[in-house]
């Protein structure tokens, strides 16, 4: 195995290296692990473009940060713009909600998350599904990812569970207003 420390906090592990530093790239041979602070990515063969400060892979991967996970077909880590891009089959999940989209990006300095293409956001409480062509959100340290649509139409459905025996009577419930 090959292990390298990039900058002061990015640890790179691979089974082997191929490439040409004069041409400015190294291929990290699978399995590949990129670990930085609280984030961890497990991937297949990944190209490290030294001049562009980019890691790219077309292989399926899984990433984890605190309680959130991300999977997709390929990724681009652009150190210059502090952005991770999942170009295909993006799936983000955290306790209580999950999001799927054709493409996603996350800026780890601003914590801005953008999902594009057939976006579906599912929440467990309440049982809610929201669909939109694009959603944007913030990755918050205590509240997880909060998504919204930027001025575009969305379609949501919410399912309510019927009252269970022994639950509050209708007269003792708080009124609902919109």
Report the location of each language-model feature.
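Mature-chain termini and adjacent capping regions
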Residues: 1-178
């Amino acid at each position: 195995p090959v292990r390298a420390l990039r900058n002061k906090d990015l640890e790179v592990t691979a089974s082997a290296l191929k490439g040409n530093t004069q041409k400015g790239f190294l291929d990290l041979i699978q399995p590949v692990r990129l670990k930085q602070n609280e984030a961890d990515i497990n991937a297949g063969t990944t190209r490290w473009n030294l001049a562009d400060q980019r890691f790219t892979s077309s292989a399926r991967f899984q990433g984890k940060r605190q309680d959130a996970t991300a999977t997709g077909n390929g990724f681009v880590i652009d150190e210059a713009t502090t952005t991770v891009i999942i170009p295909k089959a993006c799936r983000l999940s955290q306790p209580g909600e999950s999001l799927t989209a054709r493409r996603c990006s996350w800026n780890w300095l601003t914590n801005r998350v953008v999902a594009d293409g057939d976006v579906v956001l599912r929440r467990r409480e309440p049982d809610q599904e929201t669909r939109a062509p694009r959603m944007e959100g913030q990755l918050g340290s205590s509240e997880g990812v909060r998504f919204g649509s930027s001025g575009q139409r969305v379609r949501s459905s919410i399912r309510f569970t019927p009252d269970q025996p022994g639950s509050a009577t209708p007269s003792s419930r708080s009124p609902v207003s919109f």
